[in-house]
């Protein structure tokens, strides 16, 4: 460990350097996403700095029912010196001590998290639709653009489905990319779970746009929402991080010209409070908002 390395709070003044770090590692964040992360976790965002500048970042977010670790990144030239461990400890320290802590790990980061007591909960796969993919699938079902008055319903549902109080990120995503914000509604005679059997949101990115979360009551509903979101894409790369357990939806993504890119591992470090369980229905999360947000 370099003696002149410091772990301190990440501030708005650091966003330019943090963006350069994430971009140099091939990450997708834009400056406004970094700013938004600082808004939701102003006392949980940390940076590792040397006299030469920022060499690492990590953010610990208090989502109410659990903590979330995001933006764990160390400059490749500085890896192997214990910096990731120090950043992880700082981010975990920003979360109330009784809460379980979750994160989405890459294969590279998983061994570090296992050393700190994180256990595998589930697996996901990042699916990428190339910029030169053909026309989007035909949209089916009762799907319409999500409007501002719908947000309160979506946030209430998302609280239950995700277990996280992440209204800030959801509202930000809606404002950032309304072209990916869709809601599936039942006809007047349909259903027993209100008039919202599904919704999706998305956001723009430096390299690709990201669609998620996708929440629906069936594979058909999830596919209808995803098809609508694909139709809103202007021809760039599009990413969906889908739960591996939803095999029919994963097959639909493949038919829609998405290609599997890499695995992600949803992990949890138990706390004194119980780990929120994933609801069994009627609404199901088919794709996550992203490793940054849970």
Residue ranges and their predicted role:
Residues 12-15, 20-32, 157-168, 233:
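Helix-loop element at the rim of GNAT/NAT acetyltransferase active sites that forms part
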Residues 16, 118-210, 220-221:
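Amide-forming acyltransferase catalytic core, primarily the GNAT-like/NAT-type
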Residues 30, 36-56, 68, 100, ...:
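A short helix-loop-beta-strand connector motif used in the catalytic cores of GNAT acetyltransferases and
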Residues 47, 52-61, 66-73, 192-204, ...:
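Conserved beta-strand in the GNAT
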Residues 74, 80-93, 115, 218-231, ...:
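Conserved acetyl-CoA-binding loop-helix of GNAT-fold acetyltransferases
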Residues 85-104, 108-110, 123-130:
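Glycine/small-residue-rich loop that forms an oxyanion/phosphate-binding "nest" at active or ligand-binding sites
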Residues 105, 116-134, 203, 213, ...:
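Active-site/acyl-donor-binding loops of N-acyltransferases
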Residues 197-203, 209-242:
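Flexible loop/N-cap segments at domain edges
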